[in-house]
Every structure is written in structure tokens, then in C-alpha cells.
């Protein structure tokens, strides 16, 4: 009836109601599928980590700041998952600068202290390299071997790194999608952390579990997703939110503007640049694509500005 109403509506309202009915059905089945997957996760036997208090305290004592109450709460939620017998599947949400990386470091330390491998995937090579350097510094006082694996790593070096990973001589592996290629076999993965990967759907997350014996999974995002939408998109995941910024950090203000406000946005950016500050414009494409003509590329925008 709704399909008929979409194509042969009696009036404009009839067409709108028919469309809403079909949209509701699509979201309903999507949510139902996600909830079924979450139910399956509850029956999956995961890795039961044992809390290593000494190492935890040692890591926290070397930091030149204290965790916020929100970080402590979120870490407690993650720790509870790690110590349980079921597999963790959790989404960690928090603004840029809220301290998600430190929480991820605590989680990865826990899995490494239990003699499992930690895996951290970033969406780009630049971010992977930044995280690699960051974790090297954060974990410099611990005797763990950390490797970086991205698509630009030379073939000979890649083979050596992959061999170290397969033999269990690598404790923490940081990289991009190269971490999940079929040819790469892990020795004993305990926790997989994925940073800002929105296109990693339910099926892709299942494929990660096949890399080991149901390793725990933590997905991090700085995108301010409303709880209701997060449950729709990531319905098979539990949700933790860092809703507090460290002292001295300003809260991130996020705004959405229509296309007709583009000129005003550029004027605002120019004002900030004139004040000696910086502005960043992120484009979906580097160069113009015939397949996606409506999207503005970085090269085009650079010439226009």
C-alpha cells in the first residue's frame, strides 16, 4: 500500500505519509538487526582479562594530569567489559581533546599486561603515525614492542613487521586498514581499537573478530552523535560518553550551516586568520571526480579561495 501511495498518491500528504511509512520500516528492521547482533554478542565467549592494578597505577602516576571524572567513569565501564567473560563491543564518544586516547591507552595496557596483543586502527596514515608517536611516548616506561603498519610501509619492512606480529613479538600494532588484510595473521589479539571509522559497519566488525578468538572491540568517535542516533547506527554496541573536558580545555562548539551561508563561513574564517588564528577546511575529495561531480575537491576550493 505504501509503495502504491509513493508512486500513485491521491495527494501530496498521501505521498509524504507513504514515504514516512517505508522509512519507518527500514529503520525498524535496521534496529531489530542491530539488537539481534547485540544479543548474539552476549552469548559469545570472550577474553576474560584480569585487572593489573600495579601497572594501571604506574601508568597514571607518570601522567602530568589527573583523569577527569568522565574519563574515570568510562574507564570503569570498559574495564568491567574487559574483565567479563563476554566479548566487549563498545562505542566511546567524546569531543576532540576530551581524553579518549588516554582511556584507549589504559585499555590497551590492560590487554598487553594479560599477554595479549593490542591493535589500534586509524582512518588515515597521518593519524596512524601521530598515534604511533603518541603511544610510544605514553608507554615509553613500559617494556612493550610497538609497531606501525600502513600502506606506505616498504615491502621488505612490511614482511618483517608481519612476521613479528605473527610470532607474537609485537605487543601493540598501530596502523590503517592494512592491519586487517587477509594475509596478516595475529598471534593473540586481545583488544582492537578503531578510531573515527564511520564506515566500519556491523559486518566489518564481525570480520575483525575472526582475526582472533573473539577479541574485545572499542570504537572511538569525536562526532557529536545524539544518543538516539548512536543507538540506531551502532545499535549492536554499548555506549560510553566522555562528557567533560580537562581543566583549561574549551568545549568544542559544533554548528551546521546551509549552502547559502558558505560565503559568511569563509568571511568568519578570514576574520579568525586576520586575528592570527588558524582555520581548516576539510574536503571529501583531493581532486575533482567525474563519479561524484557535486562534491567539491580540495584542489578546486584551494583555487577558488
Describe the function of each predicted region.
Residues 1-62:
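Upstream accessory/linker segments immediately N-terminal to the RecA-like ATPase cores of bacterial MutS
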Residues 6-14, 34, 38-41, 66, ...:
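Short secondary-structure junctions and interdomain/linker hinges
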Residues 14-22, 62-65, 122, 126, ...:
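Generic amphipathic alpha-helical segments used as scaffolds and interaction surfaces in large
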Residues 22-26, 69-73, 77, 91, ...:
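Generic recognition of stable, solvent-exposed alpha-helical segments in well-folded globular domains
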Residues 24, 28, 75, 102-105, ...:
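Alpha-helical structural signal
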Residues 33, 77-80, 164, 271:
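Residues within well-ordered alpha-helical secondary structure of globular protein domains
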Residues 46-93:
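Conserved pre-motif I regulatory segment
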Residues 87-305:
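Inter-lobe coupling/hinge segments of SF2-like helicase ATPases
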Amino acid at each position: 500500500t505504501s509503495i502504491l501511495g509513493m508512486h500513485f498518491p491521491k495527494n501530496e500528504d498521501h505521498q509524504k505519509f507513504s514515504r514516512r511509512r517505508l522509512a519507518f520500516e527500514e529503520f525498524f528492521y535496521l534496529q531489530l538487526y542491530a539488537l539481534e547482533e547485540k544479543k548474539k554478542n552476549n552469548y559469545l565467549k570472550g577474553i576474560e582479562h584480569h585487572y593489573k592494578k600495579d601497572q594501571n597505577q604506574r601508568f597514571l602516576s607518570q601522567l602530568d594530569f589527573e583523569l577527569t571524572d568522565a574519563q574515570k567513569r568510562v574507564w570503569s565501564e570498559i574495564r568491567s567489559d574487559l574483565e567479563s567473560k563476554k566479548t566487549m563491543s563498545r562505542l566511546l564518544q567524546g569531543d576532540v581533546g576530551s581524553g579518549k586516547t588516554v582511556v584507549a591507552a589504559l585499555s590497551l595496557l590492560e590487554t598487553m599486561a594479560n599477554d595479549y596483543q593490542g591493535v589500534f586502527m586509524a582512518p588515515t596514515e597521518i593519524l596512524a603515525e601521530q598515534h604511533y608517536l603518541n603511544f610510544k611516548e605514553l608507554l615509553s616506561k613500559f617494556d612493550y614492542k610497538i609497531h606501525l603498519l600502513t600502506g606506505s610501509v616498504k615491502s621488505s619492512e612490511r614482511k618483517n613487521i608481519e612476521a613479528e606480529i605473527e610470532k607474537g613479538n609485537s605487543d601493540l600494532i598501530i596502523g590503517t586498514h592494512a592491519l586487517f588484510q587477509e594475509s596478516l595473521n595475529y598471534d593473540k589479539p586481545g583488544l582492537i581499537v578503531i578510531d573515527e571509522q564511520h564506515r566500519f559497519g556491523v559486518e566489518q566488525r564481525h570480520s575483525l573478530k575472526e582475526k582472533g578468538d573473539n577479541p574485545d572491540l572499542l570504537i572511538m568517535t569525536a562526532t557529536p552523535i545524539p544518543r538516539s542516533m548512536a543507538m540506531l547506527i551502532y545499535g549492536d554496541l554499548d555506549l560510553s560518553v566522555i562528557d567533560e573536558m580537562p581543566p583549561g580545555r574549551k568545549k568544542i562548539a559544533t554548528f551546521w550551516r546551509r549552502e547559502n551561508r558558505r560565503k559568511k563561513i569563509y568571511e568568519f574564517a578570514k576574520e579568525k586568520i586576520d586575528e592570527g588564528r588558524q582555520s581548516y577546511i576539510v574536503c571529501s575529495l583531493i581532486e575533482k571526480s567525474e563519479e561524484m561531480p557535486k562534491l567539491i575537491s580540495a584542489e578546486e576550493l584551494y583555487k577558488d579561495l
